[in-house]
């Protein structure tokens, strides 16, 4: 079953303007599936550089490769043959029509570097995340998450309400289309294959000679700390590698789109803030698999129930922006007095503080730290508690209580 993606309309619009469109995103988020859906009934051909013979030709004779695969064409996993970029540039400079080249790849940082070096101003770059909860609800016409009351009311009208148990079912089930579409029903087999493929194809290419078993242990150790401030020394100790190795491996996870970091908010007027970033996984289903939670019910009562909810909320907010091809400025706040704000959204010249709580009736005093942002040079805007309550409500005119299903 194909799940409609919010990014489809943006991709189609961009495709009418640019000869080359690059779609990045982690493995298995549905990049190729969406593009195959969009090219149904057209003359566009597809070639994947996962095919070793095609990859060899693309690397050794890119001109011949492009002759054998003329535009319009979809080139999948283009990061395996960076030699193609300069030849695509020539084709674009020679007047290639809009939509001639669709490129996909699972190493966003490297691909963006290559595109900026060889195709600056000639290619549009879009990023695809795993499925958002709105996409899983069949809703693709929705704006990025905002704490404007009108926008919250719009989300309330189109999204599907969820009980606390249903929220944890969403968290446990994850957001990768291969499993959520029903194509691969056995969740454990799916995620086991996902990790194995990622290590075999990407990690061994980027880190020659890597110990595959130790790297798998490293991912698991990181998953146990998702939603926490990054402590590479502790992770390294759990796995039995050096701090330098742990740092290099964590960069690999970030580069591959497995994890992301939330950096602390600070400015010259907030001098006592902690500098350590917090680490999150883009897919909570992967975290639950790696930490061996066998059901949503056990997860909901488990040791990571609060951290995994926070991970879910932060990643879902990011998806609402990436699905609209918009940037999202997110931070967290923690100072040396242990005052903390889970999330700060910076938008329209304001700071919007957010607390994320595994509670139906969160205590209102947890918003007390919000006032610390009044010292910042950027004005404080509307704040919120995002929690398991099923209905939208408010503490006062400046602080909403937002259900997690409404993201």
Set out the residue ranges of the language-model regions:
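Conserved AAA+ ATPase "SRH/arginine-finger" region at the nucleotide-binding site
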Residues: 124-135
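A cross-kingdom feature that marks ATP-driven nucleic-acid transaction machinery
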Residues: 1-9, 13-28, 32-45, 49, ...
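Conserved P-loop NTPase "ATPase switch" module shared by AAA+ and STAND
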Residues: 69-84
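Short regulatory helix/loop adjacent to the ATP-binding pocket of P-loop NTPases
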Residues: 109-125, 139-142
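Interdomain hinge/linker elements that couple catalytic modules in large macromolecular machines
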Residues: 133-134, 138-316
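Short glycine-rich substrate-engagement loop in P-loop NTPases that contacts/grips substrate
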Residues: 44-72
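Catalytic P-loop NTPase motifs of RecA-like helicase/translocase cores
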Residues: 53-55, 80-82, 110-111
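Conserved catalytic/switch belt of AAA+ P-loop NTPases
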Residues: 85-103, 107-109, 116-117
């Amino acid at each position: 079953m194909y799940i409609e993606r919010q990014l489809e309309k943006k991709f189609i619009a961009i495709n009418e303007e640019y000869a080359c469109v690059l779609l990045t995103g982690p493995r298995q988020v549905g990049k190729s599936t969406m593009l195959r859906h969009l090219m149904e009934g057209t003359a566009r051909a597809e070639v994947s550089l996962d095919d070793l013979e095609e990859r060899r030709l693309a690397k050794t004779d890119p001109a011949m490769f492009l002759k054998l695969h003329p535009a319009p064409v979809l080139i999948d996993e283009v990061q395996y043959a960076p030699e193609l970029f300069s030849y695509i540039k020539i084709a674009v400079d020679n007047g290639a029509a809009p939509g001639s080249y669709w490129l996909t790849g699972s190493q966003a940082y490297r691909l963006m570097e290559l595109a900026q070096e060889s195709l600056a101003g000639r290619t549009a770059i879009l990023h695809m995340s795993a499925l958002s909860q709105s996409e899983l609800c069949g809703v693709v016409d929705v704006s990025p998450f905002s704490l404007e009351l009108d926008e919250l009311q719009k989300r309330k009208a189109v999204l599907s309400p969820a009980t606390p148990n249903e929220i944890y079912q969403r968290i446990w089930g994850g957001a990768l289309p291969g499993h959520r579409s029903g194509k691969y029903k056995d969740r454990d087999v799916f995620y086991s294959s996902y990790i194995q493929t990622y290590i075999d194809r990407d990690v061994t290419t980027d880190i020659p000679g890597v110990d595959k078993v130790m790297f798998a242990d490293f991912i698991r150790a990181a998953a146990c700390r998702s939603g926490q401030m990054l402590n590479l020394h502790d992770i390294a100790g759990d796995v039995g590698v050096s701090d330098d190795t742990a740092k290099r491996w964590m960069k690999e996870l970030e580069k591959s789109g497995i994890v992301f970091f939330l950096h602390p908010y600070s400015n010259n007027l907030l001098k006592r803030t902690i500098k350590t970033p917090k680490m999150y996984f883009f897919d909570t289903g992967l975290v639950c698999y790696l930490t061996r939670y066998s059901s949503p019910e056990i997860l909901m009562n488990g040791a990571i129930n609060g951290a995994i909810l926070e991970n879910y909320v932060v990643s879902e907010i990011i998806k609402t922006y990436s699905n609209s091809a918009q940037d999202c400025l997110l931070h967290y706040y923690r100072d040396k007095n242990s005052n903390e704000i889970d999330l700060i959204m910076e938008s329209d010249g304001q700071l919007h503080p957010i607390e994320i709580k595994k509670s139906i009736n969160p205590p209102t005093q947890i918003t007390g730290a919000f006032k610390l942002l009044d010292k910042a040079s950027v004005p404080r805007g509307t704040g919120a508690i995002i929690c398991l309550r099923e209905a939208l409500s408010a503490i006062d005119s400046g602080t909403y209580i937002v259900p997690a299903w409404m993201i």
